[in-house]
Amino acid sequence: MYSVDLHMHTVASTHAYSTLHDYIAQAVARGLRLFAITDHGPEMADAPHPWHFMNMRVWPRTVNGVGILRGIEANIKSRQGDIDCHGRMLAEMDVVIAGFHEPVLAPVDRAFHTEALLATIARGEADIISHPGNPKYPLDIPAVARAAAEHGVALELNNSSFSHSRAGSADNCRTIAAAVRDAGGWLSLGSDAHIAFDMGNFNHCIRVLNEVNFPPERVLNASPRRVLDFLQRRGRPVIPEFADW
């Protein structure tokens, strides 16, 4: 049903276990048409060096009919919404996900988290906000959903938040999906795979979409073209190899 996965990690994030080649093979096996590698931003303790991201230019754009986007899951670093992806590194990215991670920015309170996320959205560097349903970072969800819709930023439903990580996220994720629906915004589905076997697994996300009657035309992952058009509207450069996708 969904042919794009926009959130996964390779062995370059050393708590993950698969290579780019592993993900390509799994994408072919699962019938995915496009995916983004989004290793953790460099302020995480086991994240890749900035050169890892700047050298993604050596990657092929397509392998065996599957498209590859060059991305990052950046860390929100402060109340002002700055992230650990900027300058040349930011310029090399096709897609930027950004979110809260405890080793970089410890939880504070609802007002702090909301202000930081609103600032991140307004700054324009992040295309997608990762796992905003994390209960350790309570938010003013309607305010975040409205801001994301206004700025053309997608909020993520993260499949791993229902299973491997961030216990207690489910109710928040339902609330987020409903708030994005009401605000007329975009949802992005992310497997958040740390091993290739989880790539493209959106089973929990799909259940939430159905529960809140989320409009399918506002889910990015439906097609490569929808994702590429979204990124171009956000000012990302056109990728010539995907012009006819």
From Swiss-Prot:
GO terms for biological process: bacterial-type flagellum-dependent swarming motility. Keywords: Hydrolase, Metal-binding, Zinc. PANTHER family: PHOSPHATASE YCDX-RELATED (PTHR36928:SF1). Homotrimer. It holds the Pfam family PHP. Belongs to the PHP family. One of its GO terms (cellular component) is cytosol. This is Probable phosphatase NT01EI_1577. Zn(2+) 2 binds at residues 15, 40, 194. Gene3D superfamilies: Metal-dependent hydrolases. One of its GO terms (molecular function) is zinc ion binding. Zn(2+) 1 binds at residues 7, 9, 73, 192. Its cofactor is Zn(2+). CDD domains: PHP_HisPPase_Ycdx_like (cd07437). It comes from Edwardsiella ictaluri (strain 93-146).
